[in-house]
Amino acid sequence: MYSLFRPLLFTCDTERAHDISLCTLDIAYHSGALPLLTRHPRPLPTTAFGLNFPNPVGLAAGLDKNGTHIDALFALGFGFIEIGTTTPRPQPGNPKPRLFRLTQQQAVINRMGFNNLGVDALVRNVAGARQRNGPLGINIGKNKDTPNEQASNDYRYCLERVYALADYVTINLSSPNTAGLRALQEEQTLRRLIGELREAQETLAAKHGRHVPMLIKMAPDLSDSDIDAAARVLNEMSVDGVIATNTTVTRPLLRQHRLASETGGLSGAPLLGQSTLVLRRLRTHLPETIALIGVGGICCGADAVAKMAAGANLVQCYTGLIFKGPQLVGECVEAIRRRREASSSGRASTQ
């Protein structure tokens, strides 16, 4: 069904197509027509950072920034949903146009700039959601006009606001579209910031009587030494998990494309190799107690398996959905299932 809808959708401006897709999804969900769009995957139970997931394939942050489509998105068969990025105060994001589709390359360049209605609006929307068929993650960031020296105040405020409703919280330090944000990944700055947020997490856990996992979302553009330094901090601070990775400011395989010079983060197929290398290096330097979510460039089941082979416990997709449609969810679940079954058969044959 999506293959019939996509050509019409791709005649629209990219950001308008995004809005139309979400509106259509909601209509299909509320009318009961959603089964015509996709087939729900069979369960593939997975456990990570103390949470149980019906399957290991989730939706990355960015599609539903304000938590207004939670019910419909879960109905597509995702094992978990991550909403946001949300900030303490509403902000409009960067001027339009700010979203560019590279159809042949199955890629997108965005410079959205954390456009959202603010954390209070998101909290109201989450409280009103009725269908949560898996864990709900909430991705939090700082406002554009908040200096890095005060960034911890923004993250702590959002953490306090969403803690009671989130199954896990992601600290977004890696969007390239908020000036200076990625500087928060520098070793000493990262250590101070995570230290403050871990203290807040422990205080909130005592207040609410439950531990909500805190994950850190990393950039793909770090050098090996920067990745290793970040891994040291993440291990020292005993974070619950890491998401690898966000979008890239480099342009792998796109140097001749007419949109390659557009400012912003690149996602989609060209990001797969780069993001998977970061994932693999993090897995090498982090203990198994710190779970990893692999995201970046997943456009088919084989891509999801590549993330798992590199050390991911879970995977997320977003840009691939634009080109493949919601059937990508089931394709990834089934590919990971086959990998698990093959691995189990291999172990059994050696015993």
UniProtKB/Swiss-Prot annotation:
It is an enzyme of class 1 (oxidoreductase). Keywords: Cell membrane, Flavoprotein, FMN, Membrane, Oxidoreductase, Pyrimidine biosynthesis. This is Dihydroorotate dehydrogenase (quinone). GO terms for cellular component: cytoplasm; plasma membrane. GO terms for molecular function: dihydroorotate dehydrogenase (quinone) activity. The active site is at S175 (nucleophile). Monomer. The gene is pyrD. Substrate binds at K65, N110, R111, M112, G113, F114, N172, N177, N246, T247. It comes from Xylella fastidiosa (strain 9a5c). It is a peripheral membrane protein. One of its GO terms (biological process) is 'de novo' pyrimidine nucleobase biosynthetic process. Its cofactor is FMN.
